[in-house]
């Protein structure tokens, strides 16, 4: 299991519709809310197998802001800031932490969007 699989499993467990990089409606019909994740990596200069990245989750709905806040609350509870959710992976260990959120303007009155950031720390090693 790697970080992509780990995140996908967590989002599925939370009941949050999630795909990586772009949303492709499984049946061709766009349903709200949906969440798209994108990774940014931080260059690390260590030899201990440590890697750091940020997952940018963009949640979109045609519902209310309360719906987005509810999704954020689920994510915040699963990946608490400062404590994180830790697990072993096939290649080492991972810790995922809630790192903030903000509304994203859409230009459409009924379309609401929020970005939720998760910090990810990985330690690669021989398992």
Report each predicted region and the residues it spans:
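Short acidic low-complexity segments
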Residues: 19-29
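Charged, amphipathic alpha-helical segments and their flanking helix caps
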Residues: 1-19, 39-127
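A short, hydrophobic beta-strand-centered structural micro-motif
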Residues: 29-40
């Amino acid at each position: 299991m790697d970080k992509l699989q780990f995140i996908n499993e967590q989002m599925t467990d939370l009941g949050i519709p999630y795909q990586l990089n772009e949303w492709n409606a499984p049946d061709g019909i766009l349903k709200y809310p949906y969440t798209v994740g994108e990774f940014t990596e931080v260059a690390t200069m260590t030899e201990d197998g440590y890697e750091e990245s940020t997952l940018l989750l963009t949640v979109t709905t045609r519902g209310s802001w309360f719906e987005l806040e509810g999704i954020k609350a689920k994510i915040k509870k699963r990946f608490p800031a400062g404590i994180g959710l830790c697990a072993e992976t096939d290649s080492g260990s991972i810790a995922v932490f809630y790192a903030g959120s903000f509304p994203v303007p859409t230009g459409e009155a009924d379309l609401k969007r929020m970005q939720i950031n998760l910090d990810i720390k990985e330690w690669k090693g021989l398992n």
